[in-house]
């Protein structure tokens, strides 16, 4: 069953003698399943290895979470027929379309900002680069800790600079979104401390107020 407003996806997969259901369409592809279809908002089905029976048809109204494409979604997933990675390229392209800033490099705040930055770089003609690398094995997402000082520490410790791509450079960074602003603030301060000449920020999603 999918939630009645369709805020989160639910997709069905199939192969000979088996069926599956998953939040992410990529989850079962390496297991030999192919995508059968997505459930509509509020739709309820009964599955067996050989069939799918609709118990409650989908309703017309949908309020799917747009954050799936800009942030939460895995790059190889599709939601409502739209591939996440392709949507992020398009978002970056649109950000660059009417932008007139001059920079040396375009970069994304890893990981989900990276695809947006590639789209921006492709449209603008400015080269894509990775002025810092994210180190994540021991650090959670920076917005998750309840304490602000811990959020600041996490955001700081995750970023490892590439000095030759920062010092004296004009940089344009794209982040997927602004939730608490912790990662963005720490990123900008980090880049200036590392010798950046200019730092321009473009969020792929409007700030959450």
Which residue ranges define each predicted feature?
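N-terminal segments that mediate ammonia production and transfer
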Residues: 1-113, 121-163
